[in-house]
């Protein structure tokens, strides 16, 4: 694979440099065909904000973030743009640390005189971490395009096939308890060898009926995980874990209330016959670190598209690997499959989208949306960066800026 010739600016010291020239955001929203809910929330729409980072060499990187309010994320992206214009996009660590400094007070940091963004109010920290993530993912896309290599190869990975699983079983008003079984049978037909069922919104008796129906249609060889969305205290979750043990559950995901701490996960892990997974809603490596250090987790989840970006996900992945906790990133397979490909047996796999209903934007946005092939794997291509192109006609059709 040859490298492209690029007109690169050279400083007086002879150092080749590329510069960031612009950050653009595209907030998008689509109404779902059918509202559904989890134990955590009701969803009637899907939202995503696309990030573009432009350079003076014509290389454009793309990133995406979930969450909201989207107008706040876009406003913060404009503020962050002022701090990074002219910086080298290949210096992702320096850029990440510079933007992260805006999330906390610092001595002498009341203004931007020191070249760093002024500290944000605490209620804007989640949106700030999302904006950092969107920019950071785009920088990694630039890095791959600059080197004319896919991101997984920049990380030292060689695998072009990554194990994947699909999530389903969202609650829909009026559907019988076992209705999700047909959806999961479809996942298996598409090639998935692992699936994840939404649970936690109903009582144990009704949940057992749903779990039993799914296990029967997927068979004993397909891995079954439960995504609980934080509904339980420790004691109730212990009872739940013991009740579902006969169905050979691979992990319990986000089982405990949001305010419970690593020590509570330790209490649950000591009594649960099923391994625990957690991490997708943690803002940074600093809180994830405490869960890993507790020894309570069998799987650590993180989401580059929710908080902090690909750089922070890499930090978490390395720390998890060092401590013997399996890596299982949350959603965004077109991004996270690159990370999984580089971590070998330390990574469980990437979560992909088995259906369009819950993730219509991802399927409309990208030329290729990573999905399971008949062999139950996501297949990575050899295109540079994250390996996808953006359908901007689709972006315009669902943009909130229209």
Predicted regions and their residues:
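Short, Lys/Arg-enriched N-terminal segments with co-localized hydrophobic residues
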Residues: 3-17
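Structured beta-strand/loop patches that form or line metal/cofactor-binding pockets in enzymes
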Residues: 17-66, 359-365
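Conserved, mostly hydrophobic/aromatic
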Residues: 20, 58, 80, 135, ...
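Metal- or metallocofactor-binding catalytic centers and their adjacent structured scaffolds
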Residues: 54-146
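Hydrophobic faces of well-ordered beta-strands that scaffold small-molecule active sites
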Residues: 63, 164-167, 193-197, 224-228, ...
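Glycine-rich, aromatic-flanked loop segments that form ligand/cofactor-binding clefts
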Residues: 126, 136-172
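Metal-dependent enolase-superfamily TIM-barrel catalytic cores that perform enediolate-based chemistry
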Residues: 156, 160-272
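Shared catalytic-loop signature of beta/alpha-barrel
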Residues: 242, 248, 256-377, 389
């Amino acid at each position: 694979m040859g490298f492209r010739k690029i007109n690169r600016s050279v400083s007086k010291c002879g150092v080749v440099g590329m510069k960031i020239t612009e950050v653009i955001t595209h907030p998008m929203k689509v109404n779902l065909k059918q509202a559904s809910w989890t134990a955590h929330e009701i969803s009637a729409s899907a939202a995503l904000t696309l990030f573009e980072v432009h350079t003076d060499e014509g290389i454009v990187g793309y990133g995406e973030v979930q969450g909201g309010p989207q107008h706040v994320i876009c406003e913060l992206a404009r503020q962050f743009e002022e701090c990074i214009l002219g910086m080298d996009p290949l210096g992702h660590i320096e850029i990440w640390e510079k933007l992260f400094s805006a999330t906390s007070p610092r001595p002498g940091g009341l203004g931007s005189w020191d070249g760093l963004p002024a500290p944000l109010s605490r209620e804007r920290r989640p949106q700030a971490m999302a904006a950092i993530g969107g920019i950071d993912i785009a920088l990694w896309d630039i890095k791959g395009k600059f080197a004319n290599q896919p991101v997984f190869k920049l990380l030292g990975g060689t695998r072009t096939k990554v194990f994947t699983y699909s999530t389903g079983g969202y609650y829909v008003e009026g559907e019988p308890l076992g209705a999700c079984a047909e959806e999961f049978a479809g996942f298996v037909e598409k090639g998935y060898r692992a699936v994840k069922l939404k649970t936690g919104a109903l009582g144990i008796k009704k949940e057992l009926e749903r779990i039993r129906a799914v296990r029967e249609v997927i068979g004993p060889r397909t891995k079954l995980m439960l995504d609980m969305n934080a509904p339980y205290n420790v004691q109730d979750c212990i009872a739940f874990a013991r009740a579902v043990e006969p169905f050979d559950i691979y992990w319990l995901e986000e089982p405990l209330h949001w305010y419970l701490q690593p020590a509570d996960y330790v209490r649950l892990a000591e009594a649960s016959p099923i391994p625990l997974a957690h991490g997708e809603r943690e803002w940074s490596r600093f809180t994830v670190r405490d869960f890993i250090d507790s020894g309570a987790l069998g799987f650590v989840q993180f989401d580059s598209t929710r908080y902090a970006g690909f750089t922070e996900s890499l930090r978490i992945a390395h720390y998890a690997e060092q401590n013997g906790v399996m890596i299982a990133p949350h959603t965004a397979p077109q991004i996270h499959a690159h990370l999984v490909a580089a971590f070998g047996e330390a990574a469980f796999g990437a979560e992909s989208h088995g259906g369009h209903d819950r993730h219509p934007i991802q399927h409309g946005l990208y030329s290729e949306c990573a999905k399971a092939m008949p062999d139950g794997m996501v297949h990575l291509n050899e295109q540079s960066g994250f390996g996808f192109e953006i359908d901007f006609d689709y972006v315009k059709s669902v943009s909130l800026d229209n």
